[in-house]
Amino acid sequence: LVCDAAGFHNTYMQFVQCAVLGLALAVYAVTLPECPVNRGGEKKSLVEALGLRAFTLFRQKKMALFFIFSMLLGVSLQITNGFANPFITSFRGIPEYASTFGANHANALISLSQVSETLCILLIPFCLKRFGIKNVMLMAMFAWVLRFGLFGLGNPGGGVWMFILSMIVYGVAFDFFNISGSLFVNNETDVAIRSSAQGLFMIMTNGVGATVGTLGAQAVVNRFVNSQSSVSAMTAGWSTSWLVFAGYALCVAIVFALVFKYKHDPEAIGNVGH
């Protein structure tokens, strides 16, 4: 919001702003209480020291499926981060939408996603207890379908409500899978490799999945948007691209619902240690 209000979104000052905020957070981090790592008394091998024992979890069908779907869903994570702004801003080239708030203040509109992300964290304990980890992860997957689909159908004029709704469901899409997935790993792994398993979860989602998703999304946008010569064709291409992303997320959600088996235990959720 500050970046948008100050007009930094099209200048190098946005990076200066981020640098200042980063330094402020670094100073704040120094003031946090000390949390020493439990290293244990035994000598560890190089494999254990590097956390590679977590890869043995792929021998378990349930964990292997979970990590594979984590990667598949991770494909969706960075798509809107990279393309939401240029998509919404592109409407400035269409006279009908050139003067709309959304087309001229895309960052302010997109910032609603972060507000939703913050608030949706508060819903996770209730939803996990009530519906279970699998259903919460399914909610996240279908939320990604809505996130992309609403982008594909909306516009910053009369359809701006679809953009706003897309920003709202982002909180469910992002939080519900990342938090519930982390709790799943916590519940299903031995304490000796739990930290490494959490790292593997992050690698599969924000590492492999996000990288594949960014490259794949760029290919889709190049095919349907950047290859067009007219503004109207590019706008139609953006809509097609978002619907392609929505279709992908829908396929992942359906297959996950069919092949991933997990029995909900409310007590296990309630007794998760931190």
Question: What is each model feature region?
Answer:
Residues 3, 119-133, 221:
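Helix-to-loop junctions at the C-terminal end of transmembrane segments
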Residues 34-66, 93-95:
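Juxtamembrane intracellular "pre-TM" segments in multi-pass secondary transporters
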Residues 176-190:
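Intracellular juxtamembrane helix-capping segments at the cytosolic ends
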Residues 142-156:
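C-terminal ends and interior cores of transmembrane alpha-helices
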Residues 24-33, 238-274:
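Multi-pass alpha-helical transporter architecture, strongest
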Residues 59-80, 168:
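Pair of pore-lining "gating" transmembrane helices in MFS-fold secondary transporters
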Residues 4-20, 219-249:
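A membrane-interface helix-boundary motif in multi-pass transporters
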Residues 4, 82-106:
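Short amphipathic helix-loop junctions that connect adjacent transmembrane helices
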